[in-house]
Amino acid sequence: LHWIMRAVLGWRITIEDRGHVAESAPAILMVAHKSNLDIIVYGGLYPKHAVVIGKKEVAKIPVFGWFFRATGNILIDRKDLQSAIASITAAAARVREKRISVWVFPEGHRNDSPTLLPFKKGAFHLALAAQVPIVPIVCSQLDGVVDGHRLLIYPGRIRIRVLPAIPTEGLGEADLEPLMETVRGRMQAAQDQLASEAG
């Protein structure tokens, strides 16, 4: 479906270094969340054996919320620490036992700014608990193809860049903050590079 939508929208999407996703599986795939159309933007990269982390509120969305839960995706209640810990622990076990990757937007919500927002900790707790690598993924700014304020879409080119995996094996909770800084720093640098290459 995403291929059809890309053709309809006139988007030319290139994915750089996509091999990092398969080579690192199972992994936590940390993705820059640019717009409501990210399902189309990143659709060609989404692995076959993967689930998505979403906030608990997603479950309340009619039809979509039911589908999200029914397909095995992970819901986390950020307002209830004990519930969040239990969800992360269960998710870590699934990642290890079923060897599934987890797709997550670490900023927590959409951000069309060139500067990444502070990252949420949940996915990093999961990566440490499961002892699987983190694969950062960024894309070029979408302001040339999506006008979110006027709800307009234009044809154009989008570049997605998959960065080398960042290992977590042997790391613990004491390494959480440095790990977050490393991942965010590499993603920001990659976004900045894509912007400079676009001229």
Residue ranges with predicted function:
Residues 18-22:
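Glycine-rich helix-loop-beta junction characteristic of Rossmann-like nucleotide cofactor-binding loops
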Residues 15, 29, 52, 160-162:
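Generic preference for hydrophobic
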Residues 5-6, 68, 95, 127:
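A generic structural signal for well-ordered alpha-helical segments
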